[in-house]
Amino acid sequence: MKIHEYQGKQLFARYGVPVPKGEPAFQASEVAPIADRLIAQTGNPVVVVKAQIHAGGRGKGGGVKVAKGGSAEATALAEKILGMQLVTKQTGPEGQKVRRLYIEQGLDIARELYFAMLVDRERRRIAVIASTEGGMDIEEVAHSTPEKIYKLFIDPVLGLAPYQGRQLAIALGLTAKETQRQFLKLVASLYACFTAEDCSLLEINPLVVTGAGDVFALDAKVSFDDNAEFRHADWNGMRDVDEEDPVELQAKRAGLSYVSLDGDIGCLVNGAGLAMATMDIILHYGGKPANFLDVGGGASQEQVKTAFQIILRSERVRGIFVNIFGGIMRCDVVAAGVIAAAKELGLKVPLVVRLEGTNVEAGRKLLDESGLTIQSASSMADGAQKIVAATRGGKAGA
């Protein structure tokens, strides 16, 4: 789950991470009072108007503007940004509509750095990544000047060691005593935030050093681990459904695990491991999966029908492969759901079904007697070849 920059900064502030003063705005009419308050509090006539979307690269896309002419200029900029379709490298060509703004005090920036924490699954550690090249696309930095990226890994038992923070400060050229002290405190606070809030990503680009030597998080990109949602009741209040995939939201509400992909073969599977294996075997035989969809071990007939509705919301889907291994899940329940969905939705794309396990014979009988054009598969490989052939004009690769 992602949150907006202003929400990330509110979270940072709770953990003692220094952030510039700022307030969110949802209408252009709210901007002038906010700008006036910031100018009065800081004595600085410069404020920054920032589009709030769940994507990076907002500045290059025209979503971040500096107002040096007080609240009137800030309001004029807000009117241009609010409602715009902001296109960045992370939104795709369709862009994302701007519905929220963050109005923030201007700072005297001397240096821009990059800082991030994320889960390194291979090492089973929290990885800290930093660079002297803040404000830039970190992927470009990694490609062109990898020597400017510094990494360290935090032992999950020992936690963040003080020497690691000092090593990072030295690598980033933060040698001034007070600046280094602030940086070490910031790193410790961010680590506390990352672990306590069950983050999967915490990124600040840029992390700035002001002319006075103070350190501030000028950006805040935060993602939470969805698996920890059960112990964070406050997450619901931070969720912005306008920024989320409506199909994935529908799946979540139905108790289904769904991720949209860019292929054209819909997949309906029970179990995450089997779902991934199904996608792999479709690719092996020359097809491209349109989604990851795990209906779980005890899905009802209604959930199976909802799963079909979700798959068919994508106009790219040219065929569907149902791959079920029934343990707790009963094959006859799946078959009944498949039949109900196909009839109700007027299914027009090829459908291949492979059933194994509990009540498999009853399930196959239901499919055979349904009167629908459903291809039965004897194995996962057989099913993958059949659906690829059906969507590729009768040919499947080996």
From Swiss-Prot:
> Please, one GO biological process term?
succinyl-CoA metabolic process
Q: What does this protein do?
A: Succinyl-CoA synthetase functions in the citric acid cycle (TCA), coupling the hydrolysis of succinyl-CoA to the synthesis of either ATP or GTP and thus represents the only step of substrate-level phosphorylation in the TCA. The beta subunit provides nucleotide specificity of the enzyme and binds the substrate succinate, while the binding sites for coenzyme A and phosphate are found in the alpha subunit.
Q: Could you tell me what the cofactor note in this record states?
A: Binds 1 Mg(2+) ion per subunit.
Q: State the pathway, as annotated in the record.
A: Carbohydrate metabolism; tricarboxylic acid cycle; succinate from succinyl-CoA (ligase route): step 1/1
Q: Which reaction does this chain catalyze?
A: succinate + ATP + CoA = succinyl-CoA + ADP + phosphate; GTP + succinate + CoA = succinyl-CoA + GDP + phosphate
EC id:
6.2.1.5
Q: What is its EC class?
A: ligase
Q: Tell me, how does this one assemble?
A: Heterotetramer of two alpha and two beta subunits.
The record lists substrate as bound by 270, 327-329
What NCBIfam families does the entry give? PRK00696.1, sucCoAbeta
Q: Which residues form the ATP-grasp domain?
A: 9-250
Cofactor dependency: Mg(2+)
Name of the molecule in the record: Succinate--CoA ligase [ADP-forming] subunit beta
Its Gene Ontology cellular component terms are: cytosol; succinate-CoA ligase complex
Binding positions for ATP?
50, 57-59, 104, 107, 112
Q: Does the keyword Magnesium apply?
A: yes
Q: Which family does it belong to?
A: Belongs to the succinate/malate CoA ligase beta subunit family.
Q: List GO molecular-function terms, semicolon-separated.
A: ATP binding; magnesium ion binding; succinate-CoA ligase (ADP-forming) activity; succinate-CoA ligase (GDP-forming) activity
State the species of origin: Sorangium cellulosum (strain So ce56)
Q: Where does Mg(2+) bind?
A: 205, 219
What keyword terms does UniProt attach to this protein? ATP-binding, Ligase, Magnesium, Metal-binding, Nucleotide-binding, Tricarboxylic acid cycle
